[in-house]
């Protein structure tokens, strides 16, 4: 019997620096560890890696001497690209996923000869978008493959192959499902071209290494099936080759706990399938209902062609090698992955907090401390005096507002690190960011670090009819904190984080009223590694309240108030979770039955979720036993086996009981400086009174308020500190050294002034 190799090693050993970028292969053929071919820097845990070539000059990368760990890997995904990656040991990990081929004319190829491949999800020949008609292949000759999901030929017109060669591979394990061919076609294409997918099994004298799908609810094969309009949109052929005379008895091709959806093209249950070796013809019956689960795909009833042409039973003294799924080894793979990720993580900050009251993983973000002061003097989307100009400036900087009102933007992206945005300095009724066009987020952090954002309103909206605009997004960034901000009217999510993230905090924010176009009024994705979410108010969201979105997520989620979610509150993929002293109140739009703190968490290791002190209004039994509010499906891990008896280590947060936090959050969350606006006032009133609902469009609730511009304070030195404040403290009015002078607590005078604006 062959089990997964117990010594599975799946991650890199080299220390990575934070980049949040894509590293591209620059040559033709070469070894992965050749940094020059990557432009001077090897891909790392915090970067994506991309390998592309041309028809005239194809690229081939061989990974044989080093462990490699990246966020996402693409092989031959460009239009008309030709590229291949050969894994010949020891290991390759792409935690967020892998694309093998993608766009029209792509010719991507992944070959696993030996070693261990660990991938979040694998897409071969596209992920369902337009113009993704590649001709791409995965070939597994040996080693071990562990992945969450494999999608083959998911795009109309694509051609792709999954080729399993013999029985040398230790195991091929898919957590969720193996999707082959198109089962979701492109609505925009009136006559979408069909996809063509092949699953090729080369059988040797001991059989072939099977594919195991093991998720209790999702583990299965999904073949192309006609939709309700009769569109089949693709073929999936089974191809058998013989490398030797086959063993007798049954041969397992795909093991699954659930019955497959659809079937191979022109191969119904019991259909004969044939293969040839040395002028001999062998035949089996194909079943989709084999094994103990009655859902394995197998070759049964072997026969061989006799001299007279008749098919007769085939019996030898050799049975096929026996493979079985062993969860313990998958857990071992994840533990090793986490160990290496931990070894590469940045250390937690120390010294001076970002501001008094900053807590959690992002508490020590430096922001613009000690840098220049930049003023936003108008509400323009770009140009001198605009917010865009300020955030795009290089170097440490603190952004202050000299005008209140509504900034309508096509999307602001923070890429330069060491930034503080002090929304509490806006005069009048404060500042609000509104989305004008495109599907980019209204405000985004991308590939940056050490950012502090406070007292800012971000309300994307659907004013142009383009409803796929998120209010705030952070990706590929670390060491940042979002404090006392208000986000609303986003779609598909309103305040969300994803990609390569680490060490961040979202605290004292109001995240409310997602736009429910296409039923996508989703609240927040929680991606990356270590994060703290505390004392936030989530209201009127359909789902993702929040959605933990990565197997690396270590989240401390406490003292939050969640009101009026639709069909689900928290769910998703995670590593560890503290879910402590949160207050959940179902509302008029809540349809989830029974209402739950967390539903269907996707975790690999046991004892990964700690729940304590949470309140579910109307469910006293859930309050007495919080685990009753975790709806974990029965599976390979039983629901109670997910429960941790102790909280996971996390930076300190001043924590109250759920009932106390409810009052504190309703009084203080959101952009309350210089004043709370009518949107947050209405949302808070809804929470207190059990009113309101999920909306489709901000017009249903009156849209953006009018924000008074106000008058900025007199600042003779233009250092960001008003004359009146300096006079009260005996400071000179026009000394250029005052603002950045550092006190005994480590704060500059400018920071002391900014922090004084938010003291109750």
Descriptions of predicted regions:
Residues 53-72, 379-388, 396-420, 426-439:
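N-terminal extracellular ligand-recognition/capping segment immediately after the signal peptide
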Residues 68-75, 93-102, 118-135, 146-154, ...:
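Extracellular beta-strand/beta-solenoid scaffold signature
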Residues 78-84, 90-122, 127-130, 407-532:
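Right-handed parallel beta-helix
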Residues 128-250, 582:
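Extracellular beta-strand/loop-rich repeat segments of large surface/secreted proteins
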Residues 698-760:
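Extracellular calcium-associated, cysteine-rich motifs in secreted modular proteins
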């Amino acid at each position: 019997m062959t089990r997964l190799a117990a010594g599975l090693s799946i991650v890199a050993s080299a220390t990575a620096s934070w980049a949040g970028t894509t590293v591209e292969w620059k040559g033709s053929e070469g070894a992965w560890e050749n940094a020059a071919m990557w432009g001077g820097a090897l891909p790392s845990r915090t970067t994506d890696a991309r390998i592309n070539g041309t028809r005239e000059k194809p690229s081939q990368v061989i990974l044989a001497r080093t462990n490699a760990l990246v966020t996402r890997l693409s092989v031959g995904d460009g239009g008309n690209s030709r590229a291949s990656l050969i894994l010949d040991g020891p290991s390759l990990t792409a935690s967020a996923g892998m694309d093998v081929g993608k766009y029209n004319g792509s010719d991507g190829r992944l070959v696993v000869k030996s070693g261990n491949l660990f991938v979040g999800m694998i897409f071969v020949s596209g992920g369902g978008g337009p113009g993704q008609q590649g001709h791409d292949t995965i070939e597994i000759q040996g080693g071990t493959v562990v992945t969450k999901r494999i999608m083959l030929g998911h795009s109309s017109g694509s051609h792709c192959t999954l080729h399993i060669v013999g029985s040398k591979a230790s195991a091929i394990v898919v957590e969720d499902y193996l999707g082959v061919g198109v089962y979701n076609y492109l609505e925009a294409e009136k006559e979408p071209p069909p996809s063509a997918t092949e699953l090729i099994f080369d059988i040797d004298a001991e059989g072939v290494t099977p594919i195991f799908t093991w998720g209790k609810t999702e583990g299965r094969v999904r073949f192309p099936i006609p939709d309700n309009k009769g569109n089949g949109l693709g073929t999936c052929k089974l191809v058998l080759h013989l490398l030797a005379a086959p063993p007798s008895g049954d041969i397992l091709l795909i093991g699954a706990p659930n019955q497959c959806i659809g079937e191979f093209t022109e191969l119904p249950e019991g259909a004969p399938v044939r293969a040839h070796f040395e002028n001999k013809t062998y035949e089996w019956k194909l079943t989709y209902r084999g094994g103990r689960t009655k859902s394995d795909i197998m070759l049964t009833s072997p026969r061989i062609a006799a001299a007279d042409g008749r098919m007769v039973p085939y019996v030898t003294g050799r049975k096929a090698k026996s493979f079985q799924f062993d969860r313990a080894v998958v857990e071992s793979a994840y533990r090793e992955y986490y160990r290496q990720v931990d070894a590469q993580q940045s250390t937690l900050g120390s010294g001076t907090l970002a501001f008094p009251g900053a807590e959690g993983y992002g508490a020590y973000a430096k922001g613009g401390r000690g840098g220049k002061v930049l003023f936003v003097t108008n509400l323009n989307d770009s140009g001198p005096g605009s917010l865009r100009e300020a955030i795009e400036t290089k170097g440490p900087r603190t952004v202050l507002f000299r005008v209140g009102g509504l900034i309508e933007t096509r999307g602001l992206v923070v890429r330069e690190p060491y930034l503080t945005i002090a929304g509490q300095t806006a005069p009048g009724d404060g500042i609000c960011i509104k989305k004008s066009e495109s599907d980019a987020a209204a405000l985004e952090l991308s590939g940056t670090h050490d950012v502090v954002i406070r007292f800012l309103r971000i309300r994307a909206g659907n004013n142009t009819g383009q409803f796929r605009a998120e209010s705030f997004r952070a990706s590929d960034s670390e060491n940042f904190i979002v404090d006392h901000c208000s986000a609303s009217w986003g779609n598909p999510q309103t305040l969300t984080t994803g990609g390569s993230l680490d060490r961040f905090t979202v605290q004292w924010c109001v995240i409310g009223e997602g736009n429910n176009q296409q039923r996508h009024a989703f609240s927040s994705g929680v991606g990356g590694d270590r994060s703290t979410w505390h004392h936030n108010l989530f209201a009127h969201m359909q789902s993702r309240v929040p959605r933990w979105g990565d197997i690396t997520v270590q989240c401390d989620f406490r003292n939050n108030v969640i009101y009026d979610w639709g069909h689900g509150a928290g769910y998703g993929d995670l590593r560890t979770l503290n879910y402590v002293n949160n207050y959940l109140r179902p509302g008029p739009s809540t349809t989830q039955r029974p209402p739950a703190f967390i539903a269907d968490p996707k975790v690999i290791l046991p004892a990964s979720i700690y729940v304590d002190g949470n309140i579910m209004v109307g469910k006293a039994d859930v309050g007495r036993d919080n685990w009753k509010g975790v709806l974990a499906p029965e599976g390979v891990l039983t629901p109670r086996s997910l429960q941790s008896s102790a909280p996971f280590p996390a930076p300190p947060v001043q924590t109250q009981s759920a009932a106390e936090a409810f009052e504190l959050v309703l009084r203080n969350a959101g952009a309350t400086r210089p004043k709370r606006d009518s949107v947050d006032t209405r949302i808070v009133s809804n929470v207190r009174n059990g009113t309101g609902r999920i909306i489709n469009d901000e017009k249903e609730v009156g849209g953006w308020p009018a924000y008074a511009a106000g008058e900025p304070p007199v600042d003779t030195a233009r250092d960001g500190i008003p004359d009146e404040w300096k006079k009260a403290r005996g400071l000179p009015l026009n000394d250029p050294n005052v603002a950045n002078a550092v006190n005994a607590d480590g704060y500059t005078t400018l920071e002391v002034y900014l922090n004084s604006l938010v003291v109750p």
